[in-house]
């Protein structure tokens, strides 16, 4: 995804990682927001903040990173102004089982993102150019196969996901069907610094 998005001229995809507790404490003490690795851009200044959820133990890191970024944890507390806060998105292998994160996410991406993420980025670009509200963007995004908006669904007495509006699609997992045309990373993402750049005693 990093390569796919950065090969486009209209998108900059940058990385950010959950800092250790000591670094998190220092960020809080000095009033410094969590920022991207490549350009040191504050997360609150980005248009979309997406998490790769690899397993359930990542759930608390998501909230930790939102808090360090100064972004309201709950999606309902971010208001309807698309330009005030980044769109908060979760994807990755464990997103299909990430319902505990539903109150905190604007969108969840279920399945393979190689086609889905660029489609969502196109929609975000269009929404910002045309001045959409956050709620309109979320409602439009669920028409992209694989995109699930927790705020537009509820659970019935049996725990089955139920749409709040009759015309909403049923969320499903997106799969890249044509591997012959699928993107393949030509350059691996590597760290900026050497891991073993210190003396071990």
Question: Where are each of the predicted segments found?
Answer:
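Short, functionally important structural connectors and interaction interfaces within domains
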Residues: 8, 35-38, 174
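Glycine-rich beta-alpha loop elements in corrinoid/cobalamin-binding modules
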Residues: 19-165
């Amino acid at each position: 995804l990093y390569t796919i998005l950065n090969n486009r001229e209209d998108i900059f995809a940058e990385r950010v990682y959950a800092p250790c507790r000591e670094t998190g404490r220092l960020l809080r003490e000095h009033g410094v927001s969590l920022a991207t690795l490549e350009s040191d851009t504050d997360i609150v200044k980005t248009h979309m903040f997406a998490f790769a959820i690899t397993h359930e133990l990542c759930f608390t890191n998501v909230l930790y990173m939102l808090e360090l970024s100064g972004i309201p944890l709950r999606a309902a507390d971010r208001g309807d102004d698309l330009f005030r806060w980044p769109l908060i998105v979760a994807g990755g292998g464990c997103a299909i089982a990430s319902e505990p994160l539903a109150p905190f996410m604007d969108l969840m991406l279920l399945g393979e993102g190689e086609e889905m993420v660029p489609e969502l980025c196109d929609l975000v670009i269009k929404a910002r150019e045309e001045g959409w509200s956050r709620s309109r963007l979320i409602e439009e995004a669920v028409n992209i196969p694989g995109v699930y908006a927790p705020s537009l669904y509820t659970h019935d007495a049996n725990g089955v996901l139920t749409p709040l509006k009759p015309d909403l699609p049923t969320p499903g997992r997106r799969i890249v069907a044509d591997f012959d045309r699928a993107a393949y990373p030509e350059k691996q993402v590597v760290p900026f610094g050497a891991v073993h750049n210190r003396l071990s005693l």
